[in-house]
């Protein structure tokens, strides 16, 4: 051997291998995009400052000017940081520094996801989301392929994991965390089926609650997606609970209860705020809730997006979830036939993605119709024909639409 293959400071044969031309072209585009974004961000920031100084910001930013300004500033800072990282990322690709480029791709993925959320809250759904969405797809692909050593490590780990999964299935431990630190293995397969099952179970539980507590004997469709019996807030909530509480399942029940209460209430507040600022939609409000005969302080503090009683329900739900329901759900998930488990996951992932995208688009065009700003384009006409206001009001019976509550610019 003419060099030490185990020395991390010495590049391996795969790391010395040249970057493909198509990736180099993309690297140049990243650098140009980053360089071009910085002056654009500075110019936009100056426009915002000028509008605030001249006092005409309210006309451009709408009724919720403070929230809009906060989101705009956050978006500007995010865009500036992303531009700088994008330049460095492009240079690393050109210089064949694959491992550094792979690390930066993870940061850019996180920044791009947040950028998408901010754009939706400020402008709704539109073609302007294509650029960050395409960039997100490219970054995800590059993060898995740009560093050959990481790709080889993942392939070896995948093959080893298949062998371990088969052994675990024989021992009745499939899906469990082999380290013993958590209960369930936090992989995409397990978390996706937790999400899907809880979307359905959460909707059933909410319907029962509404018929027995909120409005006895009256059925109301509480679905949260355009198609199917799904309420995604419960699906995402269950995934979040599973990821956070996974290592708490052996802890004191009081600790699990408190962590679940804080986590669930915070999640409920964020989802309510996001839907209201993005689409002017309010699906629930606890502003009327009382605590010992006085206005619930948590409801007052969060603008009615959660309350003390439901925070306690989140706490109790998290405790029941991690102690009783998750183990049984894991057994149910493992009943999916071995040969079809991954193909079934891919098929249902695509179905849920299509449903999710169409749900967001239908909400966006519903908002625009109520606001009187619907564009005269084919996609708007499609949603206006098949998912008009009457359809949306009947489908999302728990939602109220108020465009003035949104932060659209």
Task: Please give the residue ranges for each predicted region.
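Aromatic-rich, lipid-facing transmembrane alpha helices and their immediate juxtamembrane interface loops
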Residues: 2-409
């Amino acid at each position: 051997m003419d060099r030490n293959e185990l020395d991390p400071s010495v590049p391996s044969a795969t790391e010395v291998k040249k970057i493909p031309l198509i990736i180099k072209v993309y690297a140049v585009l990243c650098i140009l995009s980053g360089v071009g974004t910085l002056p654009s961000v500075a110019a936009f920031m100056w426009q915002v400052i000028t509008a605030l100084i001249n006092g005409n910001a309210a006309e451009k930013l709408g009724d919720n000017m403070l929230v809009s300004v906060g989101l705009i500033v956050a978006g500007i800072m995010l865009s500036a940081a992303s531009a700088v990282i994008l330049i460095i990322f492009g240079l690393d690709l050109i210089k064949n520094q694959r491992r550094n480029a792979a690390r930066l791709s993870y940061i850019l993925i996180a920044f791009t996801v947040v950028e998408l959320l901010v754009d939706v809250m400020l402008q709704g759904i539109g073609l302007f989301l294509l650029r960050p969405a395409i960039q997100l797809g490219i970054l995800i692909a590059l993060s898995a392929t740009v560093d050959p050593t990481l790709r080889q490590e993942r392939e070896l780990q995948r093959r080893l994991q298949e062998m371990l999964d088969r052994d675990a299935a024989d021992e009745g431990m499939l899906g469990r965390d082999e380290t013993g630190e958590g209960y369930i293995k936090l992989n995409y397969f397990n978390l996706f089926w937790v999400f899907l099952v809880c979307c359905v179970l959460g909707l059933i539980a909410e319907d029962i609650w509404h018929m027995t507590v909120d409005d006895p004997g009256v059925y109301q469709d509480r679905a949260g997606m355009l198609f199917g019996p799904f309420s995604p807030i419960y699906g995402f909530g269950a995934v979040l609970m599973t990821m956070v509480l996974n290592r708490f399942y052996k802890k004191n029940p009081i600790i699990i209860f408190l962590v679940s209460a804080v986590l669930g209430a915070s999640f409920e507040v964020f989802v309510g705020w996001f839907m209201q600022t993005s689409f002017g939609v309010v699906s629930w409000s606890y502003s009327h809730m009382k605590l010992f005969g006085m206005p619930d302080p948590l409801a007052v503090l969060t603008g009615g997006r959660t309350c003390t009683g439901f925070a306690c329900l989140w706490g109790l739900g998290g405790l029941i979830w991690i102690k009783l329901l998750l183990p049984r759900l894991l057994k149910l998930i493992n009943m999916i036939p071995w040969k079809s488990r991954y193909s079934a996951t891919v098929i249902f992932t695509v179905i849920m993605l299509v449903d999710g995208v169409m749900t967001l688009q239908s909400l966006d065009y519903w908002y625009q119709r109520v606001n009187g700003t619907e564009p005269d384009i084919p996609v708007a006409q499609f949603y206006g024909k098949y998912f008009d206001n009457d359809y949306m009001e009947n489908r999302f019976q728990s939602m109220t639409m108020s465009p003035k509550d949104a932060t659209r610019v």
